[in-house]
Amino acid sequence: MNKPYTKPDYEQELRRAGVRITRPRRIILNILNETEDHPDALEIFRRAVEEDDSISLSTVYHTMKLLEERGAIHRHAFAGGPSRFEQASGAHHDHIIDMDSGDVVEFHSDKIEKLQEEIARSLGFEIVHHRLELYCKKLKS
């Protein structure tokens, strides 16, 4: 049921849009491209300073804002925590948020997508955009 998707590399696209790709921006883009999780700005900062200790938290915030404005990343404001980020991709997916650990799991289900379309259509609507976030607790063994 889970379908893999690839995260695009936005560096070239940002250059075409006139955005200068500085070392901190490249490091942050690489972090987002290589990560499997949805880090917050502080976690991105921690990972960035491992590569270049001259990067400041302010630089991370400014870069994240720029990347969000350019459509290179998505900001998620999951309940109960700081904004989390992921590199934008063309493939739609939904999220399960583990309420105990805060972990975010991406998934795609054709069955859920079809049901949402059927419901919208039956009520006289066409889905333009949607976001599904399931807040869950792990099953006990």
Curated annotation (Swiss-Prot):
Biological-process GO terms, alphabetical: negative regulation of DNA-templated transcription; regulation of secondary metabolite biosynthetic process
Domain of life where this protein originates: Bacteria
InterPro entries associated with the record: FUR, Fur_C, WH-like_DNA-bd_sf, WH_DNA-bd_sf
GO molecular function list: DNA-binding transcription factor activity; transcription cis-regulatory region binding; zinc ion binding
Pfam family, one: FUR
Region (Dimerization): 90-141
One of the record's GO cellular component terms: cytosol
Cellular localization per UniProt: Cytoplasm
Keywords: Cytoplasm, DNA-binding, Iron, Metal-binding, Repressor, Transcription, Transcription regulation, Zinc
Binding site for Zn(2+): 38, 86, 95, 106
Binding-site positions, Fe cation: 92, 94, 113, 130
Annotated spans, DNA-binding: 1-89
Subunit structure: Homodimer.
Family as reported in the entry's similarity comment: Belongs to the Fur family.
Functional note: Acts as a global negative controlling element, employing Fe(2+) as a cofactor to bind the operator of the repressed genes.
Name of the protein in its database record: Ferric uptake regulation protein
Organism: Brucella melitensis biotype 1 (strain ATCC 23456 / CCUG 17765 / NCTC 10094 / 16M)
